[in-house]
């Protein structure tokens, strides 16, 4: 069985501040002292430089831990007349290692199709970023027992456009739409069932990828349910929304992941 290092990625969405970043790093510097889990901060783009500076300023205090920076989105284009967009190269220049791709809010609110998501996945890797690919089903799809069908479709388009080996440098986040921002989380058993399906799906085309890829759970993860979720054999950590805005809760989640 592969030894997959757990990851906790904090997606601030359109929230947070430079002060929140400073508060997080103040707690990280005294409490985050080992590398048994990887921590990724994904603030709004306007705060990437603030987080980068804090990473540099706290380099000595964070020695021995793995705290990284990621972005919440990127353009599928390298450059051009795309007002308001940010390219993969720009994110790389800012110090990002990761970027969230295909979050349900981007798909739903901004009309990002699976084809666009696949293009963004490619753009991220082209510029040396590791994509955190989000997949997940809606409430009606789950009620209709179409969860596996929906997720397979979302995965297959990325595979068709980028190849299976592209997942050698990728993270997957399962985020059931009915649990994102609702306060209603999937049960550990529900999460494990879907994560196992994702791993099996990828194993069918590459046993190595299937065994080694990290699959995060995202959807109302809190310190009260994280231990049971992270204890599941195919759950490798969490993509955290609301709880990432509370420094104490987020640090608790990081600590739980380190002991998972």
Curated annotation (Swiss-Prot):
Gene from which the chain derives: tpiA
Residues at the active site: 103, 175
Organism: Shewanella sp. (strain MR-4)
Protein name (Swiss-Prot/TrEMBL): Triosephosphate isomerase
Name of the top EC class for this enzyme: isomerase
GO process annotations (BP): gluconeogenesis; glyceraldehyde-3-phosphate biosynthetic process; glycerol catabolic process; glycolytic process
UniProt keyword annotation of Endoplasmic reticulum present: no
Gene Ontology terms for molecular function: triose-phosphate isomerase activity
E.C. number: 5.3.1.1
């Amino acid at each position: 069985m592969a030894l997959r290092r757990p990851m906790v990625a904090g997606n601030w969405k359109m929230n947070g501040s430079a002060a929140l970043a400073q508060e997080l790093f103040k707690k990280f510097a005294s409490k985050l002292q080992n590398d048994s889990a990887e921590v990724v901060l994904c603030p709004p783009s306007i705060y990437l430089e603030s987080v980068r500076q804090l990473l540099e300023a706290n380099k000595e205090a964070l020695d021995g831990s793995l705290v990284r920076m990621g972005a919440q989105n990127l353009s599928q284009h390298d450059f051009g007349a795309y007002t308001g967009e940010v390219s993969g190269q720009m994110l790389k220049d800012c110090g990002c290692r990761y970027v969230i791709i295909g979050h349900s809010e981007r798909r739903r609110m901004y009309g990002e199709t699976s084809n666009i998501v696949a293009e963004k996945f490619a753009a991220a890797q082209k510029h040396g970023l590791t994509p955190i690919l989000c997949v997940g089903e809606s409430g009606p799809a789950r009620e209709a027992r179409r969860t596996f069908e929906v997720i397979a479709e979302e995965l297959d388009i990325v595979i068709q456009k980028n190849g299976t080996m592209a997942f050698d440098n990728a993270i997957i986040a399962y985020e059931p739409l009915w649990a994102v921002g609702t306060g209603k989380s999937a049960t550990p058993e529900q999460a494990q069932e879907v994560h196992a399906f994702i791993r099996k799906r990828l194993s069918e085309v590459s046993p190595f990828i299937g065994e080694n890829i990290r699959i995060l759970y995202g959807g109302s993860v809190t310190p009260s349910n994280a231990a049971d979720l992270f204890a599941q054999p195919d759950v490798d950590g969490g993509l955290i929304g609301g709880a990432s805005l509370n420094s104490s809760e987020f640090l608790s989640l990081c600590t739980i992941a380190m002991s998972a």
